[in-house]
From Swiss-Prot:
Database matches in HAMAP family: AcetylCoA_CT_beta
Record gene name: accD
InterPro entries registered for this protein in UniProt: AcCoA_carboxyl_beta, Acetyl_CoA_COase_Trfase_b_su, ClpP/crotonase-like_dom_sf, COA_CT_N, Znf-ACC
SUPFAM superfamilies in UniProt: ClpP/crotonase
Domain of life: Bacteria
Organism: Staphylococcus haemolyticus (strain JCSC1435)
GO BP terms, alphabetized: fatty acid biosynthetic process; malonyl-CoA biosynthetic process
Protein name: Acetyl-coenzyme A carboxylase carboxyl transferase subunit beta
GO MF term list: acetyl-CoA carboxylase activity; ATP binding; carboxyl- or carbamoyltransferase activity; zinc ion binding
UniProt cofactor(s): Zn(2+)
Alphabetized Pfam families for the sequence: Carboxyl_trans (PF01039), Zn_ribbon_ACC (PF17848)
Length: 288
């Protein structure tokens, strides 16, 4: 009897896991973590704060359409060339699949959104790059869309504002992507020769071929705080010159101190600053 008792109690017990159907789950996208200080915030409140962290003031990437909404008069934006998409001119393996994946993820056709809008009643041409799409890299379509809106602004005598956010030229398009550096610069030269205003607004990050072309040749060059701006990477430069670079090298504040920017503007002051600049440089209409 006692032998049977101890034998039964020594047998391994089996447990059954019961799923809790009432388990509370946080809906996807309701919270956002700051990439710098790691603070978790309500996404809705963060969006209302223009994606600026409440804790550390870090300027989190702002999607193209959100930025356009933040700087324009309500319902004044008219988009150009919305359906234009990249082909695969070099038959680069996997390139088309990556483009389609980014299109689904971002609801964008390419890495830049262009069009016309008004700010305090002043009409202007605008292009806004979005680093979520192929890291904002500049390929044939990005260059073409930017050139088209610049040429439209030149023809209709409009000021032009461009927000850059890019990792540089798109490697999958090779020399075709590099050609966009010269192509966009030529369109900007015609715009400048017409006596029209070009405001370049550099956001994080603006690097490579974009920083070496249209992003750096504005009549007025602005940037957001702490934005990374440069051509080659920090490590590449240090290895090339065999010197240690300053800690704040390639930041917006460093460029401002060395005369390469006109002003570093907090995102909450972005709309007001642009409105003032557009009004100050507004073309005076001559009497007939």
């Amino acid at each position: 009897m006692f032998k049977d008792f101890f034998n039964r109690s020594s047998k391994k017990r089996k447990y059954l896991t019961v799923q809790d159907s009432k388990q509370n789950e946080v809906p996807a996208g309701i919270m956002t973590k700051c990439p710098k200080c790691k603070k978790i915030m309500y996404t809705k409140e963060l969006n209302e704060n223009l994606n600026v962290c409440f804790n550390c003031d870090h300027h989190i990437a702002l999607p193209a359409y959100k930025r356009i909404e933040a700087i324009t008069d309500e319902n004044s934006f008219v988009e150009f060339d919305k359906g234009m998409t990249s082909a695969n001119p070099l038959d680069f393996p996997g390139y088309q699949e990556k483009i389609e994946k980014d299109q689904q993820k971002t609801d964008l056709s390419e890495a830049v959104v262009t069009g016309t809008a008004k700010l305090d009643g002043v009409q202007f041409g605008v292009a806004v790059m979005d680093a979520r799409f192929r890291m904002g890299s500049m390929g044939s379509v990005v260059g073409e869309k930017i050139c088209r809106i610049i040429d439209y602004a030149t023809e209709h005598r409009l000021p032009f504002i461009l927000f850059s956010a890019s990792g540089g030229a798109r490697m999958q398009e090779g020399i075709i992507s590099l050609m966009q550096m010269g192509k966009t610069s030529v369109s900007l030269k015609r715009h400048s020769d017409a006596g029209l205003l070009y405001i370049s607004y550099l956001t994080h990050p603006t690097t490579g071929g974009v920083s070496a072309s249209f992003a750096s040749v504005g009549d007025i060059n602005l940037s957001e705080p702490k934005a990374l701006i440069g051509f080659a990477g920090r490590r590449v430069i240090e290895q090339t010159i065999n010197e240690k670079l300053p800690d704040d090298f390639q930041t917006a504040e460093f460029l401002l101190e060395h005369g390469q920017l006109d002003k570093v503007v907090h995102r909450k002051e972005m709309k007001e600053t642009l409105a003032q600049l557009l009004k100050l440089h507004q073309e005076v209409k001559k009497d007939a």
